[in-house]
């Protein structure tokens, strides 16, 4: 897919410190949207799940989900940049399948940018996965990976994240 440079997106350097992920925006250290949301969300569900499955299993599941999510993002980013990406290793199969399912089920007409830094009045910043024209409408997309469907109340942070990106 061809990249259309519709907006002059800036790039902000991202780094982590003891308080979480931050971006350097015009010499100001600005917290990331995900750091803010992580600090304000109710962690009881995650804590209960960790107690139920045990720390070792919870860590294994989280590492596996992170690996699959990162790989899926790579496939989507490179594909939408027109470069193509293929991890022939066994761990690449599931992310490829997930990315293909996404791309087969979304109508992306123009790609305006991948991995775009966004910031709002030096208050917060983040990186959205895709800015594009989808179904004839300007869209901000942040890809999410899950091994099974999530309940509506479990994705509230995702909606808040996209709302913050929309403001930026």
For each feature predicted by the language model, list its residue ranges.
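Mg2+/Mn2+-dependent nuclease catalytic core
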Residues: 112-168
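Metal-dependent nuclease catalytic cores that hydrolyze phosphodiester bonds in DNA/RNA
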Residues: 1-125
